[in-house]
Amino acid sequence: MQEALNQKIDAFVAANKEQILKDIATLVSINSVEGAPEEGAPYGAGPRAALDKTLELAAGMGLATRNCENHIGYAELAGADAEKYLATICHVDVVPEGNGWTEDPFKMEIRDGWMIGRGVADDKGPMVATLYALKFLKEEGVSLRYPIRALVGDNEETHMHDVDYYLANYPAPVFCFTPDAEFPVCNGEKGHFDGKLVSPVCNGVIKDFVGGVATNAVPDRASALVATDITKLRNAPNITLEPEGDGVRIRGWGKSGHAAMPEGTVNAIGLVVNYLLDNGLCNDAERAYLEAVKKLHDSTAGVGLGIDCADGPFGPLTIIGGKMSMVDGRMVQTMDSRYPTCTDGDTIAKQIRAAIGTGAELTDVGSAKPFYIEADTPAIKACIDTYNEVTGENATPSTRGGGTYARHFPYAVSFGPEHSDMVLPEFGGPMHGANEAAPIDKLLEALKIYIIALLRLEEIDF
């Protein structure tokens, strides 16, 4: 029976491959970065357009759809149970495109078996895969015990207010998985801490300081405008100098990446901070602030701020500075930390305040606790067993730093489709980075995994 099912799925995937890629390209073409709220578009026009188009694609597959008051939506297959249902959840909003792209970020390109475009990995590609999983079940006429909803989020990258709205107004699924992470199964996520380091009004040498496009992304470029003579400045690696007005624009060039996975990135804001300090381009108040910010950028493990720690399930804490801006004469540096169970938001805030002293003010603090679900529960076993059977691996559930929708649900995990050992091609970049890339074959394999996993979840007594 399993062999026959595998053959049916393989045939379905092969027959639908080209349309799957077209549908992903359609969603990628929509710039769905969060925007200003509008009537009927609480997260901006772009996310609303992506939500509408996704539901349109689902309806074209013969799936029932619902727009939940423009906050979120879903495609659904009916089942016998009138109260309990299973769900997947992906999101069609994206982080800002940022800089460094060699192609149009909103025009999907295919090169050597890879998709390139903003959202191909995070999370428009996986969104389309879940719709096709439901399409397969519908076309095969599978009689479902539990209805299955493919939830379509559009505020994941910023606040996740979409899923908060859904859970406040609709019953929660008995189990949910989100294809917004890595295989095999992620049954725990680090805590999340964020805040801002704000300077006093300095009225000094630094006239402007900007960098980054999102709090949860390592910036690949940043710049500061300083009142000085360019002939007095020296060259430095990854720094360029340009005359601008009566001063000099100092630009830092780094390497972008996701805040939860900062290994291998180079923070451009940190490069500029170091250059300003090394060359004395600051008055006393500015120096005190830059010294505080330098402690943030000295280590993505939080060593400079005295918040570094690690535990068994989650590993080490990470922290990055995502955006720098000037607001009403004050420099404002955002930060994003993912922390394990050996600390908490209050402790992190206290330690940061002790580290920065009077040089900066820590404001706008927010945190969410880590979550963890035991790996031996039936639903998680169904997911991990399916993954291992399809791939031939012997993987076990793991935890991660990135925060997903899973932490909002009573019983949920993240489930692919990325692979931690995936090697990006030279022309490809990571999630949240330039030239975001995803391998076509792995996404199609994930589709097969999702179909089989959903069938197995249908057999569980929830």
Regions found by a protein language model. Give the residues of each.
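Acidic-glycine-rich active-site phosphate/pyrophosphate-binding loop
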Residues: 95-110, 192-193, 198-199, 242-252, ...
